[in-house]
Amino acid sequence: NSLPADMDTELIKSQSSLGLTLSEKQAEAVRMWAKSPLSIITGGPGTGKTTTLRVILDIYKRVRPKGEILLAAPTGRASRRMAESTGHPEASTLHSALGLFADEEDRYLGGSQPLEADLVIVDEVSMIDMRLAAELFRRVETGTQLLLVGDPDQLPSVGPGNVLRELLRCGLIPTVHLDIAYRQKNASRIALNAHTINEGDKDSLAYGEDFRFLPAEQAGEAAQIVLDVYQEAVTHQNLLEVQILAPFRSRGECSVKRLNE
């Protein structure tokens, strides 16, 4: 029932059947996963995490056709996107997979049974707090492979802990970081520019209809620019299609509270 030690033949088969070509880094991630009971794949938007998962799932279903697979993510939206993008029939929220619900004091109640799966893949791990991670690790049985996928540069969970970053920092878990942003026909400039900014290359930003940069010297000036752009946008678009994302809830001139005032 174990996975083949030599993944090269399986990689060739899956790339051919799926009609895609992996980068060397993506192939390295697949090889790492194949020989690791616990492993991590990280990368920013558009770096090929989903493509890598598609190959992993294709290989697993071929070499272990009777193996139970569980895909999970912290939120309903993330789990639906995971199922759609990988082509797997179903993905669950972590709470549902673990049989958990929160009481009025935000304590987890419910399930205690081990996860009935041979391969567990969890996406958007940066959103998982310490308590949910503890429940997940407690329920994974010996012999079950656990693959964690996420972007360490995303905002950490609302709850306590920065689980993904701490797992990476410990240096004990096999990890591959995908660091090449692939330009696809419909790629968002926001995703591409996020990668560029992470690389510290502010001079190579791609500007267009979906990405503009409006400089401001003071926080108050920035807040006014945001409000001006918002008011202009809602005159041309449906009000429900326009959003403002602010870095803080109540701190500073550009907080959610001040902008709403």
Where on the chain are the PLM-derived regions?
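Pre-Walker A segment
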Residues: 1-44
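Conserved helicase motor core of P-loop NTPases
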Residues: 1-3, 9, 14, 32, ...
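Generic amphipathic alpha-helical segments used as scaffolds and interaction surfaces in large
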Residues: 17-21, 43-47, 69, 124, ...
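Conserved nucleotide-binding/hydrolysis modules and their immediate coupling elements
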Residues: 18, 129, 261
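ASCE P-loop NTPase helicase motor core
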Residues: 27-30, 34-208
